[in-house]
């Protein structure tokens, strides 16, 4: 099996329409380059990411990974290919941040903690300033 580079798209669960469009475009480009997308799996941002991912012509059934805070897989975004219900609540931010690279779009304290973990793991971090 060939390893696929995993890029986490993180940020506030609820972003505005400009942020949604940005996330969709980023996600589509990530999949077109042959990478996977990791998110927290809940809210508007992951839904936009997965919509963008699925719009890529080369999208497969293993391109989107949702790392959920709870034990229940049901709340995951419907476009999720791989759902990992961790039961770790906010501590699952460590798992998300252990991706190969991080793209932050908006966000608050939770996003900041994911960025801090990514920094500790020496992962590349890209930040986009949008309301969220």
Place the predicted regions along the sequence by residue.
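Generic N-terminal amphipathic, Lys/Arg-enriched alpha-helix
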Residues: 2-17, 26-28, 32-33
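A conserved mid-protein helix/loop that constitutes part of the nucleotide-sugar donor-binding site
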Residues: 20-21
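Acidic/glycine-enriched connector segments
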Residues: 24-31, 40-121, 127-131
